[in-house]
């Protein structure tokens, strides 16, 4: 991929052979962002485990990720009032199921009560493809719809590694204070280490980097980050 002059000039600010502590990495990564909009600060970390399909869960970022999350809730009766009061943008039962079945997916997260899952499950080809299918392990199949909506709105994100074993997550915006970004990142590390499979051997997090949406990736001293976060 061809890189522009702006990127090449910014890349010279970062020593690609060096591993930085997390405070330095966040400061450097933010300084290389060259978007006209408020870009996202992202982390990438490679997990050391053979059964990648077992690595997944949710992380509640203390300062959110700066993203407005439009939540849809499939539920009935009084639960609909609870979901609306919590701030869900779209609330309904069979009416919403029919709308989504028609191809509408103009929302970012989806919650369902257990009694709705028989019908919601039929939307698998649509919701599954976009990563929107409610799941008990992710806390999005629940009777406490208000709690689920609040957590999604306040920055709870779902994680899973890609085929190469790398977990990618947005942890805030370039406009965030450095301290808030660092705290969000430390929360990611704490959660990943807490969720580490019991039979994982050696260093669980092999590499770690921080980068803006458009900018330069900065390598982090992963051992120091883990040791100072847990």
UniProtKB/Swiss-Prot annotation:
Protein name: Large ribosomal subunit protein uL1
UniProt keyword rRNA-binding, yes or no: yes
Taxonomic placement: Bacteria, Pseudomonadati, Spirochaetota, Spirochaetia, Leptospirales
Assembly mode: Part of the 50S ribosomal subunit.
PANTHER family, alphabetized: 54S RIBOSOMAL PROTEIN L1, MITOCHONDRIAL, LARGE RIBOSOMAL SUBUNIT PROTEIN UL1M
Listed GO CC annotations: large ribosomal subunit
Keyword Membrane set for record: no
Coiled coil region boundaries: none
Example GO molecular function: rRNA binding
Membership in a protein family: Belongs to the universal ribosomal protein uL1 family.
Role noted for this protein: Binds directly to 23S rRNA. The L1 stalk is quite mobile in the ribosome, and is involved in E site tRNA release.
Keyword vocabulary terms for this entry: Repressor, Ribonucleoprotein, Ribosomal protein, RNA-binding, rRNA-binding, Translation regulation, tRNA-binding
SUPFAM superfamilies documented for this protein: Ribosomal protein L1
GO BP field: regulation of translation; translation
